[in-house]
Design a protein with these regions (language model features):
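A short alpha-helical cap/connector motif
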Residues: 1-107, 114-135, 139-189
Length: 189
């Protein structure tokens, strides 16, 4: 996959095949028409999501790095996806997400700055429709999340976000032990 090779060239860690297959499955089961992704990378996870979405579905992907988005645009086009199937927004997720439509998305995939996971969740819960799913990548964070002795900013932030999800009565969630861990949480309703 060209997008995976490009990721290695620019120093981006793409989602693994197991995590990608899980994203494809979720997008397909949800018959997703609208998905938000935080952390475009070079398009690896976006390709999995696009392939699982309904025909004509639109992926909105947010990333700070315009170069990463250029590479993702190339990957999506090379894979045969028409430009109207994806919307790439360069900018901080915390600036972009508040401008997106409430309850307008079937799936929200979070794979951006780990320190901002809790804030991403606050936006995602507003963006996802009832019955939709919020997915956090790196929920195990190299097996550091379960170790209380690990207190670095990323690990602590992921741990806090996962606790927020677990404490929220509006959600039913599951931790999928694929790749570096995917936490999937469905908005009940």
């Amino acid at each position: 996959m060209a997008a995976r090779q490009k990721a290695q060239e620019v120093g981006v860690v793409p989602i693994g095949n197991g995590g990608g297959a899980a994203l494809h499955f979720l997008a397909s089961v949800l018959q997703a028409r609208n998905i938000v992704e935080v952390g475009t990378g070079t398009g690896v996870s976006g390709l999995w999501l696009l392939r699982g979405m309904t025909e004509g579905g639109v992926l909105t992907s947010v990333d700070l790095e315009a170069e990463h988005q250029r590479l993702a645009r190339e990957a999506f086009s090379e894979a045969g996806f028409a430009p109207q199937r994806f919307r790439l927004i360069a900018g901080s997720a915390l600036d972009v997400l508040p401008r997106l439509t409430d309850a307008g998305y079937d799936l929200v995939f979070l794979d951006g700055d780990k320190v901002e996971y809790s804030e991403y969740f606050d936006e995602a819960i507003r963006l996802v429709r009832p019955g939709g799913v919020i997915v956090f990548d790196n929920a195990l964070w190299h097996d550091r999340v379960a170790d209380p002795a690990q207190r670095d900013p990323e690990t602590s932030a992921i741990r806090d976000a996962l606790k927020k999800v677990g404490d929220d009565d509006r959600l039913r969630s599951v931790l999928l032990p694929v790749g570096d861990g995917l936490l999937a949480a469905q908005l009940i309703g």
